[in-house]
Regions:
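Membrane-integrated ABC transporters
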Residues: 1-34, 46-61, 75-79, 83, ...
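Transmembrane helices of ABC transporter permease
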Residues: 12, 16-29, 131-186, 258-269
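An intracellular "coupling" helix at the cytosolic face of ABC transporter transmembrane type-1 domains
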Residues: 12-15, 100-104, 120-129, 133, ...
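Juxtamembrane helix-loop junctions of ABC transporter transmembrane domains
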Residues: 22-23, 27-43, 47, 55, ...
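Helix-loop-helix
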Residues: 49-53, 149-166, 172, 176, ...
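Pre-NBD coupling/linker segments of ABC/ABC-like ATPases
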Residues: 316-329
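ABC-type nucleotide-binding domain
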Residues: 327-577
Length: 577
């Protein structure tokens, strides 16, 4: 999964990566050459007192060092550029895929997990690319090249390499093997703590209202402790790795000095050669350390790549047909034909063979008890959900055959829980239509009964709005959402219980003002208060997912027992008579 992801997303940066590999190879070759130069200066210059040779070779050695530094800096810069660009592309692709998800896919992953996958997980893969680009050539060439150079210059000491390298490889392998299963556990724990944190921030009012602060603190503490334990275990193993490497290195160097010193005394090895051998030994062990570091990063990045690929491989249940149309023969009409809807992995039908037609420019209200399917109808009309069977038609076109952008342009939806984005009043209203003028915004605010409080806010239309609209009241937030839908001037307006946060007088004024402002616009209203929809051209009554009544207020009082029961419970027996 990791290789497939990298192969796909690094292809545009092949040129950069080739340059990185060439520069890294040059840098390593220079690094391997430096100990030999140093040995020659000692053996042929210092030992013989030839200062001219020392100056000449010293200057050459300085030039090689400068070239090594330039290659290293350039390789690191290009590697970082390739890795950051790949990370940007990957985040964009994940975001584009998630943006097309329906409520079903988002619920399946969880919002917190999707955020983690597009931030932390991408960062881990990005870091692997950067480290691999700088170490992929360096580690093996340095280790193998160091062995060749060391054996060539001091064959009598090469047995020390044969002892130290296997010991180091076994030790590193044992530690890394213990770390692998911990990485997936850590990512799962990270998802869990992000989910808890997000729920607590989103539901802070509910938590306080039910005095659940202590319980939620304990819940977060448990999640925090879980991730801390896994992280602590990873840290313990990681911390153990480097002292172990240094121990092997130090013991080996002591051995080199001990046995090499005897060989120098016997005249078998020159002093410069012994120093070069120690330098090569350090390079060999550093190559192994870099390789071991990569073996630590690769499993964690592999887990992250798998989680990212899982998102990218998930196909949205709501997709656009290749032959999608953007024309609607009868603008403003809304129709359902024998629509049934069942949530995935559920047995009960939320809607069962529901059929109705809404004529252009008319007002249709939808009423029913809790869990009768009212909001599901709204989501199906806006194609936020896909019908299990039957047809949903907007403007005479099946929503499954319509281009999503063109479909959504036909309607303005005011959800049950309106959401405002961080910005200003104007920027939120212009989400519906960017080219709307200030006069049009004020006109929509006046109809939505929001002009008074917006004009009193500092800045008016430019007054700041916090994320989620948390700096305005629930009723104000709902009125701004209604104004936003009005600014759009769609063929169809859908209100999903959008007046519930308004008091009776404000509700009445808004409906009175909305009448002339929405002439010719089809309105579908999910309502709880029967008194507010008695003038509707058509009222649909849902009960347990079935359409049990359809008609005007007067007709339903005479023909629909469920509607009479609703009216009686809200307005009294006299109103239902």
């Amino acid at each position: 999964m990791l290789l497939r992801l990298l192969r796909t997303h690094l292809r545009p940066y092949t040129g950069l990566l080739v340059c990185v590999l060439v520069l890294q190879f040059a840098q390593v070759m220079a690094s391997l050459y430096l100990p030999t130069l140093n040995a020659d200066i000692i053996d042929k210059g210092v030992a013989t007192g030839d200062s001219g040779y020392i100056w000449r070779m010293g200057a050459f050695m300085l030039g090689v060092s400068l070239a090594q530094g330039v290659c290293s800096v350039a390789a690191t810069y290009l590697a970082a550029r390739a890795a950051m660009s790949m990370g940007r592309d990957l985040r964009g692709e994940v975001f584009d895929r998630v943006s097309g998800f329906s409520e079903r896919e988002i619920s399946a992953f969880g919002a917190g997990s999707l955020i983690t996958r597009n931030t932390n997980d991408v960062q881990q893969v990005q870091m692997l690319v950067m480290m691999s680009a700088t170490m992929l050539v360096t580690a093996p060439v340095m280790a193998v090249g160091g062995i060749v150079m060391a054996v060539t210059r001091a064959p009598g000491l090469s047995w020390l390499i044969g002892v130290s390298v296997p010991v180091l490889l076994v030790a590193v392998g044992l530690i890394v093997g213990r770390m692998l299963p911990l990485f997936r556990s850590y990512q799962d724990k990270l998802d869990a703590i992000n989910r808890v944190m997000r729920e607590q921030l989103t539901g802070i009012r509910v938590i306080r209202a039910f005095v659940r602060e202590e319980a939620e603190t304990e819940r977060f503490g448990d999640a925090n402790t879980d991730i801390a334990r896994v992280g602590e275990r990873v840290g313990q193993l990681f911390v153990l790795l480097f002292p172990l490497v240094m121990l092997v290195l130090d013991v080996t160097i002591v051995g080199v000095i001990w046995f090499g010193g005897h060989q120098v005394g016997d005249g078998d090895v020159e002093v410069g050669t012994l120093i070069a051998f120690m330098s090569y030994l350090m390079q060999i062990l550093m190559g192994i350390v870099m390789a071991s570091f990569m073996t630590i990063m690769i499993p964690r990045a592999a887990v992250c790549a798998e989680r990212i690929s899982e998102v990218l491989a998930t196909s949205p249940t709501i997709t656009s047909s290749p032959d999608a149309v953007d024309t609607f023969p009868t603008p403003g009409t809304v129709e359902m034909r024998d629509v049934t809807f069942v949530y995935p992995d559920a047995d009960a039908r939320v809607l069962a063979e529901v059929s109705f037609t809404v004529q252009p420019g008319t007002t249709t209200a939808i009423v029913g008890s809790t869990a009768s399917g009212k909001s599901t109808v709204v989501r199906l009309l806006a194609r936020l959900l896909e019908a299990s069977s039957g047809q949903v038609l907007i403007g005479g076109t099946d929503v499954r055959e319509a281009d999503p952008e063109a479909l959504w342009a036909q309607m303005g939806l005011v959800p049950q829980q309106p959401f405002l984005f961080a910005g200003t009043v104007a920027s939120n209203l212009r989400l519906g239509r960017e080219e709307a003028t200030d006069d049009e915004l004020w006109e929509a605010l006046e109809v939505a009964q929001a002009k008074d409080f917006v004009s009193k806010m500092d800045g008016g239309l430019e007054a700041p709005i916090a994320q989620g609209g948390t700096n305005v009241s629930g009723g104000q937030r709902q009125r701004l959402a209604i104004a936003r839908a009005l600014v759009r001037r769609p063929d169809i307006l859908i209100f999903d219980d959008s007046f519930s946060a308004l008091d009776v007088s404000t509700d009445a004024r808004l409906r009175e003002a909305m009448g002339p402002a929405t002439v010719g616009i089809t309105k579908v209203i999910v309502a709880q208060r029967v008194s507010t929809i008695v003038e509707a051209d058509q009222i649909l009554v849902l009960d347990g997912g079935h359409l049990v009544g359809s008609g005007t207020h007067t007709e339903l009082l005479a023909t629909c027992a469920v509607y009479r029961e609703i009216v009686t419970s809200q307005l009294g027996a006299e109103a239902a008579a």
